[in-house]
Amino acid sequence: MRLTNLTWPKAQEYFEKNDMVLISIGSIECHGRHMPLGTDTLIPDHLLEKIEKKSDVLIAPTIPYGSCQCLAPYPGTIDINGEVLYQFCRQIFLSLYRHGARKFVFLNGHGGNIKMIERLGMEFEDKGCLVAMLNWWLMAWDMNPAWKGGHGGGEETAAILGIDPSLVDKSEIGGELKFKHLSDNLKTTGFRSVEFKGVNVDIIRNTPHVTDSGWIGPDHPSTATEEWGKEMLETTANYIVDFMEEFKKVKLS
């Protein structure tokens, strides 16, 4: 059930009987040379399509933008300042709260949004609400450790292949991941992580200073298959439907 498709009397009718709303958020950012900029939004959107067929929970419009400062130099990336994003989402929550929403299920497609969602969760708990943050890619890891992946790696590439194979430019996947190290003894191991004497520390850099392509992770994009993506997306959507049914039962004080 989509909020955008309801008349206001129908919305009123929903909130008289229900207090849960499902919202998704993503980002528009680089995911390597082979992946669409909208990866983090396309995946939650696709999950919503599956969920809508199996659940009667009200679905609010997707928020397509996110906070992605470290990836901002890549052409096409749209970075929303963390405070601006928080205030924008807060206004959405306040409007829904006014109408009767008390349980918010935030389906998240982008790691850079996590701090903002946590902040909303703390604020709205003080108002008698609960905010569930569902980071789909982390949930998928728990469902099947073989699906574990990084940014623009096999996991996300498989998901996009499962949605629309034409969106993945396989000719741009390339060879092994090449990090840009700070020195012979300061070896880059991730977005921020640098290994020194067997210990990882964080050194904050823009992603083009870490790797050229923009994908990072232990799972090479070439390992992705359409079948993997379809199974992972179906399993994740089914889990979310089951979770929301259980979440409905929670009594708020």
Please provide the spans of the model-predicted regions.
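Extended, histidine- and acidic-residue-enriched regions that form the cofactor-binding/catalytic faces
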Residues: M1-E83, Q87-K103, G111-S253
